[in-house]
Design a protein with these regions (language model features):
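Accessory alpha/beta interaction modules
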Residues: 1-156, 171
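Short, charged alpha-helical interaction segments and adjacent helix-coil junctions
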Residues: 2-17, 21, 25, 83-88, ...
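Selected N-terminal structured segments and early membrane-anchoring regions
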Residues: 117-118, 165, 197
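Short, well-ordered beta-strand micro-motif
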Residues: 127, 162-164
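Low-complexity, glycine/alanine/valine/leucine- and proline-rich hydrophobic stretches
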Residues: 147-156, 164-166, 176, 180-185
């Protein structure tokens, strides 16, 4: 019995040793430290005076139909606005619609019935991924709604910021993102992140909560692999149907959550 327990502890230690801030299981633990989230947001939002009043890691909210949305780090800032920070490793869904959906749920959740729209709180969504959702060369992309005809910005109080660890453009934000890929951080520019990661990894023995998180993480990764394999299988089927002229390319591309031009490259390749 004692031997099995020691083996289990070693397995947990091995898994935790490989975890990085970009891994949602570790990010969930790191987000319990408000000062850490503050450090990260000050870099990404390029505002050294930002204050985080509260943060709820792995917060769950529901829409009107009862569907739950789990938010990695749901923050209230010092000026009364809200910020949701998410980390994403899996590239098997429409990320822009995911961000839009989560933002709508957050807005509905923090707005009281009968409240004037002028009083709706500002919201920033920070979406951190291991890949570049824009397939460009930048580390960070700022998006806001604009009028097509004039280019004027729509003052709706909402902004989505997409940050990735893939592109290193030499900026301070890119430096932070490279730390998100490391199992050990030794960068004096981000002392709270470095120290908190060390603390989490050094406090494993006897930590039942961490053991449970590791087990949940293993199960979640297995489920993600299953979804990715199913998505790949569906994509192959759609390509075959288009090649056999049994399905229109536009419809197939829509079902694959891709543009028609991107989908046709797969068909022709």
């Amino acid at each position: 019995m004692k031997k099995r327990k020691l083996e289990h502890q070693r397995e947990v230690q091995d898994v935790v040793a490989q975890l990085r801030p970009i891994d949602d299981i570790m990010f969930q633990r790191l987000c319990e430290n408000i000062l850490l989230i503050e450090e990260v947001l000050r870099v990404i939002l390029e505002d050294g005076k930002i204050k985080v009043k509260s943060v709820i890691p792995q917060s769950s909210i529901q829409n009107l139909h009862g569907r739950s949305v789990v938010l990695d780090a749901y923050c209230k800032l010092g000026d009364g606005s809200y910020c949701n920070v998410e980390v994403q490793r899996s590239d098997s869904d429409n990320h822009f619609k995911r961000v839009r959906y989560n933002a709508a749920c957050i807005t509905a959740n923090v707005t009281d019935p009968g409240e004037r729209f002028e009083q709706v709180k500002d919201l920033i969504v920070v979406y951190i991924s291991e890949f570049d959702v824009f397939h460009g060369k930048a580390t960070i992309y700022h998006t806001r709604m604009r009028a097509d005809e004039t280019g004027a910005r729509v003052p709706d109080g909402y902004q989505a910021i997409y940050v990735n660890t893939k592109n290193n453009d030499g900026s301070r934000i890119a430096e932070l993102m490279q730390c998100f890929l490391q199992t050990e951080i030794d960068n004096p520019n981000f002392p709270i992140l470095a120290e908190e990661l060390r603390a989490e990894k050094g406090n494993i023995e006897g930590d039942e909560a961490m053991c449970k998180i590791v087990e949940d993480y293993a199960e979640k990764r297995a489920q993600e692999r299953g979804r990715e394999e199913r998505a790949a299988g569906m994509q192959d089927t759609l390509i075959a149907l288009v090649k056999e002229k049994l399905l229109a390319p536009a419809i197939a591309a829509q079902k694959a959550n891709m543009s028609e031009s991107e989908f046709m490259k797969l068909v022709q390749g």
